[in-house]
Amino acid sequence: DYSFLQHIEIPGMPSTREEDRLEKRISDTNQCPQGICTTDDYVLVTAYSATKDAVGSLHVFDKETGEYLVTLGMKKKSHLGGIAFDGNSVWVCHSDNQTLERIPYGFIQGLAAKRQKTYVDCTKSIKEYKVGNRPSCITYYNGLLYVATETQFLNSQMIAYEFEDEKLKEKSIYRIPSKVQGVAFAEDGTIYLSTSYGRTKSSYLKVYDSLSALDLKPTKPQMKVEMPPCSEEVTI
């Protein structure tokens, strides 16, 4: 049941400005939400800062109630984006420097349990991993991290990585269409791509039966649903 999601108040939004100022929920007011994922305990939302030298944010909300718990201050000067949970760690895309940040789930649980409801600087507590493609969005499925690169016009690629022995190992590469902002897998392997570009053009949710179907014909999804502009990450 995701009915509570309509009540989540993300720090940095116009409706939360008073609380943000009083409780110091964010490092600056120029925040732009980008990614979302869920765990058994939390809803996690990323936001990058458009202010030079300011840090991005990872907001943590209680999954049962939607209550805001804490904000993790992330790396400076990064276009903080897609986010995924692999059961042990949370992975966050940093497209500007072509890295993924890994946050141990226990670290997030420890901060969330305190219910500080404020910004906590975590810039020195998180490890980075270089990847072979610019990470725009990410998801976890069947033991692998799938990292997709957004392009404006031409078809792009999505690379599957395995995390083993403290390293990310490239396993396979798939073709994807342009403008991909989010990716998610259903349990049966069906793939959902959120595609968008620009504030005045429609977004589209593109559905593929399998990875092989996506790779074979990236511009011909089995289903395409028109949506409002500016769709970003998608989660199931």
Stretches found by the model and what they are:
Residues 111-141:
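Asp-box/WD-like beta-propeller blade repeats and closely related beta-sheet repeat scaffolds
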Residues 38, 44-53, 92-97, 147-152, ...:
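Conserved beta-strand positions in repeat-built beta-propeller and related beta-rich domains
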Residues 12-27, 67-73, 122-129, 167-174, ...:
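A short beta-strand motif characteristic of beta-propeller blades
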Residues 28-35, 77-84, 128-140, 177-185, ...:
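Repeated scaffold domains used in trafficking and secretory/extracellular systems
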Residues 173-213:
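Loop/turn-rich, solvent-exposed surfaces of beta-rich toroidal or solenoidal domains
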Residues 17-54:
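Beta-strand-rich domains and repeat architectures in extracellular enzymes and scaffolds
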Residues 40-42, 87-88, 142-144, 188-190:
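Short coil/turn segments that connect the beta-strands within blades of beta-propeller domains
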Residues 52-59, 98-107, 153-162, 200-209:
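Structural motif
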